Amino acid sequence: EDLSFISLGNRVVKTVKSDPNGKVVVTLYPGDKPGPVEIKATLVSNNTVSVLSKNVAVSTGRVTQNGLSLSASKNSLQDDKDGDTASITASMADRNGNPVPDGTTISFVAEGGSITPNCSTTKGICSVTLRTQNPRPLDNRVSVLAYVEGDKSFIDIDGDNVYTENVDTLNNNIGDFFRDDNEDNLYNASLGEFIYKRSAGKLACALSSIGQPNIADTCDNKLDAVLRKQMLFAFASDTPTFFGVSGVDQSMSKISNFTNFSFKVFGNSARQIPMPSGTTVSVSAKDNSEFKPVAQLISVAGVNGVPDTKNIVVSNAEPNTTIQVKLNDSYYFVNIAGNGTGTLTGQSKDLTGSPVVEYTNTACEAEIISGNLEVPGIMSLFTPASFKDVSADVAYSVKMKGCAVSDDIKIMITAPNKVTTRTITL
């Protein structure tokens, strides 16, 4: 209904002459609403002859604030070498969900490494490459900021598909912006954070966030803006940082029980990032213990020094187990302490014979029962302060079976360029 033709604003029938080749060329002026368009041409000399246009539609506009998104092939790169890369894809749509016009250009800046400065869209998307190299931020966390000319998101109160100032409502108004290198949602000039100033506005803005940095009180009520979107990346070491959580000490040198333990693996010593994407984690056990328990029947003297009971005593057994002892045609069960010995007291003084231990040495086994066996391509990096406590992508639990003193548990971290093992002897 808002399309015009031949001249801007015209919606009435017009007569147009053909060129020497018999062609009639008509200029169309799209309006503000998307949809199919049909143009009818009728021969003046014979109005029974007419034709309708085909495959004409109004479909694209400028990228809108909530139509800009970023994705990445991975977000934890190898910091120990130059040249590890991640592909970052910008997807852009207008407020009606249509891809923006081909050739829309979006720019990128990065806190660390190097990044392709811009890309131009085809069918609403384009991609750039983030590459590890100097500079390398000390906290191994890299902010990447993308920005593009577009329109703010708004609620179309009057339903005309056009933003009308003081009638329609802007969603999450945005003004000037910055690259939030230290992730505190504030612009810090002393850190040399990248800043983009264009607005002369003084109105309040939406709160700044990691995904959409915003400088307070730089907004206006206009529709056009420089849209922005920020992502976080980790530049992670191939050398893991271990941290014991439960069932093992924090330094991962001693396991306190023989069943389960849990730990975390980080990509830097500050425990603020995961290992590089694609790193694998495995666990194995080595059985170094071979127990040969022996049982004895020992008399116990009463108050008068005369034996009145007997004990079944087991030694050289596997700690913290229960041993089955056969004596004559009966079976007795002896609980073994941590030192490998156990005593079953209070047996009859008339009990005789040679007790025999029925025991099979069990092999030590270990398996990861929770945690990523391969570090994912995409993970939440949370905040520098909270990552070590809340990230599930760095947490692992191990179940042990049949393990005893002197057995070894080996954790193997296979990063893209390095293999690290941590062996814990029980």
Residue ranges and their predicted role:
Residues 1-426:
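The feature marks long extracellular or luminal low-complexity segments
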